[in-house]
Amino acid sequence: LDGDTVTASGKMLSKIYAESDLAIAETINNGVLDKLSDIEIASVLSIFLFESRKPEAPKIPNTQVQDALKDVVAIWSKLHNLESEHDVKTQKEPDFGFCWLAFRWGGGHGLNSVLKNSDLTVGDFVRSTKQLIDLLNQVAGAKSELREKCMSAIKKLDRGVVVYLGGVA
């Protein structure tokens, strides 16, 4: 707020409905997603939603995503420290477990190829992808400069088994 007026950052935050809404908004405000491709944006945003079942070293698609993830972790760390100082916890820790899968699926790879060497079930994959699509829609509405890339990522992710099982998962 600026007095009684909601700031641009506040308006943008009001369009994000996720557990890590503040970390997502700060990621957007800091321009972390601005120079990424559509699928790189999806890969990075997946860390705010996914929860790995077992600890594995995650695969990171490329250096652009890796650099963005470092920036996001720095943002999350600042928020986490601030929350710790005030005895609150609203931001879940980023989880890189879906980055590679989102990147490969969005890149047009088949389901068997994407899930190879993963312990994720098809249902969990569809659910995670649908959640990512929902977040991409929110980000598209929150920052107009990211709208085109987010909508492009959605088209690339919302296909095949995701469409077929989307209403069931």
Which residues does each predicted region cover?
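Acidic, serine/threonine- and proline-rich low-complexity intrinsically disordered segments
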Residues: 1-2, 41-169
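Accessory beta->alpha helical hairpin/"wing" motif in late/C-terminal subdomains of nucleic-acid enzymes
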Residues: 2-35
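Core catalytic DNA strand-manipulation module of type IA topoisomerases
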Residues: 12-13, 34, 39, 62-66
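Extended, well-ordered alpha-helical scaffold/bundle regions in very large, multi-domain proteins
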Residues: 20, 33-44, 48
